């Protein structure tokens, strides 16, 4: 039996801190292909629903608002341009000492979007009732404040 929890932006799996590992280039390169398998999606959706069964949870993912929690009180579809997402990822990886070109990141992000938008199981799409936030020109603080404001209105 596995246990997972998040504490202050860190992710733990069976008492092992795995935050950096799940954000590695290797995981990023393979996540779309793995998540396209029906058995993987079924198991993940069940686990995610179990984690959120009592409400009061903030969860992110490419199908959270359409598949995992289609009746969530607040759904936000957060996006940014491919260029900005690549720039942000580049800076994140640079801090970790990982080297990759900005152009390579743009290609990988575009390809992941294409794969996720066209997969048969749980495709990436905005829920009809989700609030669209384009964060291309926003700081992380501005994004957080915008989402918190929306959440307060939902209460």
Each model region followed by its residue ranges:
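Anionic, Ser/Thr-rich low-complexity intrinsically disordered regions
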Residues: 63-64, 70, 76-87, 95-108, ...
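Residue-level signature of catalytic and energy-coupling elements of molecular machines
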Residues: 15, 44, 58, 109, ...
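Conserved acidic
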Residues: 36, 40, 101, 139
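ATP-dependent NMP and nucleoside kinases share a basic, alpha-helical "lid"
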Residues: 19-22, 26-31, 35-96
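Short, small-residue-biased leader/transition segments that mark boundaries at the very start
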Residues: 2-7
């Amino acid at each position: 039996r596995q246990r997972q929890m998040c504490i202050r932006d860190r992710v733990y799996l069976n008492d092992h801190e795995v935050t950096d590992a799940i954000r590695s280039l290797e995981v990023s390169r393979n996540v779309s292909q793995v998540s396209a398998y029906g058995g993987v999606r079924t198991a993940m959706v069940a686990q995610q629903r179990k984690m959120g069964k009592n409400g009061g949870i903030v969860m992110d993912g490419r199908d959270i608002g359409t598949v995992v929690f289609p009746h969530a009180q607040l759904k936000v579809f957060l996006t940014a341009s491919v260029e900005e997402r690549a720039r942000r990822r580049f800076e994140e990886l640079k801090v970790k000492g990982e080297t990759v070109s900005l152009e390579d990141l743009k290609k990988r992000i575009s390809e992941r979007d294409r794969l996720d938008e066209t997969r048969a199981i749980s495709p990436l799409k905005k829920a009809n009732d989700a609030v669209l936030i384009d964060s291309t020109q926003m700081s992380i603080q501005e994004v957080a404040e915008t989402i918190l404001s929306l959440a307060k209105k939902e209460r």
